[in-house]
Amino acid sequence: MAIRKFKPYTPGTRQRVVTDFSEITSAKPERSLIVSKHRVKGRNNRGVITCRHRGGGHKRQYRLVDFRRDKRNINAKVAAIHYDPHRNARLALLFYEDGEKRYIIAPAGVKVGQNVISGESVPIEDGNAMPLSVMPLGSSVHCVELYAGRGAQMVRSAGASAQVMAKEGDYVALKLPSTEVRLVRKECYATLGEVGNSEIRNTSLGKAGRRRWLGRRPQVRGSVMNPCDHPHGGGEGKAPIGRAGPVTPWGKPALGLKTRKKNKPSNKLVVRRRRRVSKRSRGGRDS
């Protein structure tokens, strides 16, 4: 997979960088694996906005993705690589020997015609799913379960991978993409390799309209609002914030505030916390 740059024929193409979609082998999804999905547009069940800047965008159909990989010891052939409008990663369409079809997150390097399998005694190859207890130390994994049988909950985005660091007792230490080292039960399943489409980080939308197509509405700075709408608002001209640091629209500190509960039960499974991102590298966007 590669990226595609455009010549500056228009202002919208000047900064536009997209993936070339060369790995996509079929434009139409598998009809038996798509369902309609209600677009909530950032609202809750009462219609109140709970997530700002959401709404609009192109119509989508949700692809049913197999995050459990619970068809054990049955060979599956990669029939096609499909585009998924709900995520940056691609989907691999699997045809199992018993006739069933399923989608999985497409690992990097997986080709059409390749065979993948899940189980405890399967080859150590990218795309195969197995318990963490049988994976070699130092191997890269993705689609990791937090609880056995619940399905993959971590390391599912494009280009992401975790590393098997150590095994001790009933737990396996994983280094996550955030640099956090966390203990996971050894019977939890994961898939070898990293998620494909890693070049997505080098793309650029190029214009505001492409962001609207993806269902994202404009984000207005708090400093240009009125005082009744945002703590940063008001003042004459380009007035400063007037506080020690930037805050959210509800008055909470916007940068550096830890939101994880101090007494969360899973804290004992975190061996090393993720690396802190400095304000300089994070940027102080006016929320």
Curated annotation (Swiss-Prot):
* Residue numbers spanned by region Disordered: 221-287
Sorted alphabetically, the keyword list is: Ribonucleoprotein, Ribosomal protein, RNA-binding, rRNA-binding
This protein's record includes keyword RNA-binding:
yes
Q: Which GO terms describe its cellular component?
A: large ribosomal subunit
InterPro entries assigned: NA-bd_OB-fold (IPR012340), Rib_uL2_dom2 (IPR014722), Ribosomal_uL2 (IPR002171), Ribosomal_uL2_bac/org-type (IPR005880), Ribosomal_uL2_C (IPR022669), Ribosomal_uL2_CS (IPR022671), Ribosomal_uL2_dom3 (IPR014726), Ribosomal_uL2_RNA-bd_dom (IPR022666)
Question: Which stretches does UniProt call biased (Basic residues)?
Answer: 258-287
GO molecular function annotations of the record: rRNA binding; structural constituent of ribosome; transferase activity
Q: Name one GO biological process term.
A: translation
User: One Pfam family, short name please?
Assistant: Ribosomal_L2
Q: Which domain of life is it from?
A: Bacteria
Q: Mind telling me which HAMAP family this protein's record contains?
A: Ribosomal_uL2_B
Protein task: One of the primary rRNA binding proteins. Required for association of the 30S and 50S subunits to form the 70S ribosome, for tRNA binding and peptide bond formation. It has been suggested to have peptidyltransferase activity; this is somewhat controversial. Makes several contacts with the 16S rRNA in the 70S ribosome.
Similarity section:
Belongs to the universal ribosomal protein uL2 family.
Q: How does it assemble?
A: Part of the 50S ribosomal subunit. Forms a bridge to the 30S subunit in the 70S ribosome.
Q: What is this protein called?
A: Large ribosomal subunit protein uL2
- Give the source species: Prochlorococcus marinus (strain AS9601)
